[in-house]
């Protein structure tokens, strides 16, 4: 099965890699750059709050990212209201980062769960202003459908709380979301190891976004490679079509020619 034609398409943009990665929590910029390279990711998300917009003379993580090679996805991490998230996206666009944004509006500091009411409010405004919005949301099919209906280019339900490494806690909801919306479904948050990423892709998700799963590993470079392979393997397995699960065995060897 050819994989070079199996591209991720978001708002008309084509990407070969279905893995998206963040830029935080690395030991240094050099480690970040190497991990991103090894991951094979083409979409890199950056927290607008971490980018030094006001003083370009100071070192910034953007100094270490080749924007001709990667697509930047500014995110609104740390925003707890729609107004704050909207302001942050406007700043990103004015600074020349991108109008292709990952929208986060958090509702709780302990769980970092999204505030879906504020998220929908912010998404409506940003879409009207011409932003391409990829919202981080709960694994609620109803909310995901509402986000699609107002014009979001994809939906990004969490697999588990941000940074928890708990994996895909509710695969059934993810399946329902996949059956409910037509835009790409990107699992965002909770992926802790390669098997988590593979499971997300085997469910039929169009991609996976992660940061802590790679940056927080004992060897981030090795984990970046593992996640790269896992996403590709999971996608290939999904397209290949797994065998159905059955309670009893089915012999894999032919019974013809057996000695009586």
UniProtKB/Swiss-Prot annotation:
Pfam families: ThiG. GO terms for cellular component: cytoplasm. It catalyses: [ThiS sulfur-carrier protein]-C-terminal-Gly-aminoethanethioate + 2-iminoacetate + 1-deoxy-D-xylulose 5-phosphate = [ThiS sulfur-carrier protein]-C-terminal Gly-Gly + 2-[(2R,5Z)-2-carboxy-4-methylthiazol-5(2H)-ylidene]ethyl phosphate + 2 H2O + H(+). The active site is at residue 102. Keywords: Cytoplasm, Schiff base, Thiamine biosynthesis, Transferase. One of its GO terms (biological process) is thiamine diphosphate biosynthetic process. It is found in: Cytoplasm. Its EC number is 2.8.1.10. InterPro entries: Aldolase_TIM, Thiazole_synthase_ThiG, ThiG. Pathway: Cofactor biosynthesis; thiamine diphosphate biosynthesis. 1-deoxy-D-xylulose 5-phosphate binds at residues 163, 189-190, 211-212. One of its GO terms (molecular function) is thiazole synthase activity. SUPFAM superfamilies: ThiG-like. Belongs to the ThiG family. Homotetramer. Forms heterodimers with either ThiH or ThiS. Catalyzes the rearrangement of 1-deoxy-D-xylulose 5-phosphate (DXP) to produce the thiazole phosphate moiety of thiamine. Sulfur is provided by the thiocarboxylate moiety of the carrier protein ThiS. In vitro, sulfur can be provided by H(2)S. This is Thiazole synthase.
